[in-house]
Amino acid sequence: MIQAETRLTVADNSGAKVLGCIKVLGGSKRRYASVGDIIVVSVKEAIPNSKVKKGDVMKAVIVRTKKEIRRPDGTYIRFDDNSAVLINATKEPIGTRIFGPVARELRAKRFMKIISLAPEVL
């Protein structure tokens, strides 16, 4: 469950290290986002000479959350961190590599490029 002001780690090699959630997209009253949802983020920390700079405002898709996700078969999955992947206007990842596992729910949301780049899909 990600909401405004939440800090997230970055699961790609775009150059950003820490993101801050500004807004959860999907209606003015929407408060929380989960895996596969798109949020507006600000880059809080970035490495030098990278594609993104500190203070950049962009969109990101959530790939891991600490809050467990209930699957249709009754099982739950949760991760050790809240992580996101930066995306461009066409919903393609900015980075060329994804680090760590990602949730299977991304496939239903049609983020196939992220699924194919990820080392493990849980």
From Swiss-Prot:
A GO cellular component entry from the record: cytosolic large ribosomal subunit
Pfam families with a match to the protein in the record: Ribosomal_L14
Taxonomic lineage from the root: Bacteria, Pseudomonadati, Thermodesulfobacteriota, Desulfobacteria, Desulfobacterales
InterPro entries recorded: Ribosomal_uL14, Ribosomal_uL14_bac-type, Ribosomal_uL14_CS, Ribosomal_uL14_sf
The protein, known as: Large ribosomal subunit protein uL14
Assembly, per entry: Part of the 50S ribosomal subunit. Forms a cluster with proteins L3 and L19. In the 70S ribosome, L14 and L19 interact and together make contacts with the 16S rRNA in bridges B5 and B8.
Family indicated by similarity: Belongs to the universal ribosomal protein uL14 family.
UniProt cross-references to HAMAP family, sorted A to Z: Ribosomal_uL14
Keyword Signal: no
Organism: Desulfatibacillum aliphaticivorans
Function statement: Binds to 23S rRNA. Forms part of two intersubunit bridges in the 70S ribosome.
PROSITE patterns reported for this sequence: RIBOSOMAL_L14
GO biological process: translation
Keywords for the protein's UniProt record, in alphabetical order: Ribonucleoprotein, Ribosomal protein, RNA-binding, rRNA-binding
GO molecular function annotation: large ribosomal subunit rRNA binding; structural constituent of ribosome
